């Protein structure tokens, strides 16, 4: 992406007793099915794939999409999500079951699976991997930033604070059984377990942190070939003793680290890369030259540009305690005044999609245009404003809104278009710009803003991941200080519902309540901007921007 977006989460604790629940899941492969591609495929070969320099490829720090892409090939977590079937399936776990209270999960592991060093993957491997993330003594240089994934596991607080030596909520009755006890009901917990950061680690990860950090030993379909050469390259080769399905079709992957998107795309055009991101200003030309994927996610010969929806959103937060923005009607008017399509077309040349709600396409439970006032309707906005904030002789309404944002990437252009739309209706606007790090660490946490921009990327493909962290009272990511007792109760009720369909239906009810309050203004959803070379016979990139490269085939 061309701008920084938040993907660190803190799940605020809370929960109710769940109804009876039991679930089993069959083992499955990551990603989608690419078997339908036509043409002959070459045996093996090495895929040349562009990434920026990642922050980490070790599960200890897997949080941004560049490192996640590498880690996804090296490690297999307990579960994975099949987007082509909208179904969570087992990966390192062949099945799981849940107690009646939905606060204890028993995962049954694939037996005899191996790490890349030949040692056996056991339940202890998961326990020590999770404890390695939380234990403040794991690294002398920095604590892991991703412990929030385990915040609901019993014993999280004690271990992360250095007051305990183990995560007491995780036990290992035998080598092939992992039992996880939560501190509250959360029926969606198996979705949390799909994150690559929660993969198992072998004993060597505990023996030498620095060595493992640059050359991780995992249980995935590919293994390291040498170590990560910081700023230059990461090489992987097929792991022939892979235990969770078919072996990779590729011989290996060369992750070619480039400094920026434009440089990488130039390398792609020169024939030096097989997969690269397309700069926004060149996407239309790329589609014309290379052809567009039929489903947006699967690249095949002659249809090589991926433009599918991603599980992410760009939105405006509103400080609901602000003297002006505490007025719900004004918040609705501000949303109605914004021409989202113009932003998508002008700033992003159609590579974004106007957001009709906070939950993006690709999430089970998504409803198109669910937030009725997340649309462009100047007349409706003007009607609200005329009734409550009539304009004076100069067309001014005695309203002023300051927008907080960073100047990186395209944010200035987006915010200027938003302010122009508001100004056209007699609202005085101004900018409050700062460095992104300062905004995230000071401005937003202290609620020192009226309105501000933010991006949100899904950790897990569930509605809860877009509703609970952003809108529950007191939530660490609820920067606008929104609070609605009915929303809080609905979210907690939903978390404890056993049935997937009933749980999603409850989240949809809560989503409607939030839409009525309009505590944030959805602006647009993100889309893929990737291209594959003609060497690639078939490649599938899911809505989370992850690709199971064990299924990738090169053309003969």
What function would you assign to each model-found segment?
Residues 11-12, 344, 430-440, 465-534, ...:
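Extracytoplasmic/peripheral linker and loop segments enriched in polar/acidic and small residues
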Residues 30, 353-388, 407-413:
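Structural transition elements
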Residues 50-100, 217, 546:
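N-terminal lobe/hinge region of extracytoplasmic solute-binding protein
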Residues 122-129, 175-181, 221, 250-252, ...:
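Alpha-helical secondary-structure segments
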Residues 125-127, 134, 141-202:
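Surface-exposed binding/hinge segments that line
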Residues 205-210, 241-290, 419, 428:
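Ligand-site clamp/hinge motif
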Residues 530-556:
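Long beta-strand-rich cores associated with HINT superfamily self-processing modules
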């Amino acid at each position: 992406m061309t701008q920084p977006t938040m993907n660190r989460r803190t799940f605020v604790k809370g929960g109710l007793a769940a109804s009876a629940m039991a679930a089993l899941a069959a083992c499955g492969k990551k990603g989608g099915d690419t078997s339908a591609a036509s043409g002959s495929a070459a045996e093996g070969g090495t895929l040349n794939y562009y990434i920026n320099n990642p922050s980490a490829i070790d599960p200890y720090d897997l949080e941004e999409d560049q490192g996640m892409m590498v880690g996804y090939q090296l490690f297999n977590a307990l579960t994975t999500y099949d987007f082509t079937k909208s179904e969570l399936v087992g990966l390192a776990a062949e099945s799981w079951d849940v107690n009646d209270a939905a606060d204890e999960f028993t995962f049954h592991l694939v037996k005899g699976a191996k790490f890349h060093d030949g040692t056996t993957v056991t339940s202890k491997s998961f326990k020590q991997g999770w404890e390695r993330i939380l234990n403040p003594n794991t690294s002398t240089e920095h604590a892991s930033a991703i412990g929030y994934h385990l915040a609901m596991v019993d014993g999280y607080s004690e271990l992360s604070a250095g007051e305990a030596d183990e995560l007491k909520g995780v036990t290992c009755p035998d080598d092939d059984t992992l039992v996880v006890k939560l501190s509250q009901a959360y029926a969606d917990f198996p979705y949390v377990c799909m994150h690559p950061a929660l993969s198992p680690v072998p004993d060597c990860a505990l023996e030498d942190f620095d060595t493992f950090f640059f050359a991780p030993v995992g249980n995935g379909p590919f293994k390291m070939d040498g170590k990560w050469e910081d700023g230059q390259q990461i090489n992987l080769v097929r792991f022939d003793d892979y235990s969770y399905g078919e072996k990779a079709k590729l011989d290996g992957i060369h992750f070619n680290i480039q400094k920026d998107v434009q440089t990488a795309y130039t390398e792609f055009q020169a024939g030096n890369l097989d997969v690269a991101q397309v700069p926004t200003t060149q996407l239309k030309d790329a589609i014309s030259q290379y052809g567009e994927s039929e489903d947006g996610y699967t690249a095949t010969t002659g249809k090589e540009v991926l433009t599918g929806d991603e599980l992410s959103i760009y939105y405006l937060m509103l400080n609901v305690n602000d003297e002006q923005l505490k007025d719900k009607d004004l918040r609705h008017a501000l949303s109605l005044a914004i021409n989202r399509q113009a932003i998508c077309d002008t700033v992003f040349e159609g590579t974004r999609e106007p957001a009709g709600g906070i939950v993006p396409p690709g999430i089970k439970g998504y409803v198109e245009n669910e937030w009725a006032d997340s649309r462009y309707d100047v007349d409706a906005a003007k009607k609200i404003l005329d009734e409550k904030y009539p304009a004076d002789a100069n067309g001014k309404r005695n309203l002023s809104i300051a927008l907080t944002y960073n100047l990186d990437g395209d944010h200035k252009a987006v915010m200027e278009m938003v302010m122009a739309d508001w100004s056209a209706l007699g609202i005085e606007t101004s900018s409050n710009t700062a460095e992104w790090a300062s905004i995230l660490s000071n401005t937003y946490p202290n609620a020192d803003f009226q309105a501000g921009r933010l991006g949100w990327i899904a950790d897990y493909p569930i509605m809860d991941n877009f509703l609970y962290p952003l809108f529950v009272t007191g939530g660490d990511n609820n920067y606008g200080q929104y609070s609605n007792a009915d929303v809080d109760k609905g979210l907690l009720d939903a978390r404890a519902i056993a049935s997937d369909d009933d749980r999603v239906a409850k989240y949809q009810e809560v989503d409607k309540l939030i839409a009525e309050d309009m505590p944030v203004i959805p602006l647009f959803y993100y889309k893929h901007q990737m291209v594959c070379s003609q060497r690639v016979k078939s490649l599938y990139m899911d809505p989370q921007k992850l690709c199971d490269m064990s299924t990738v085939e090169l053309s003969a």
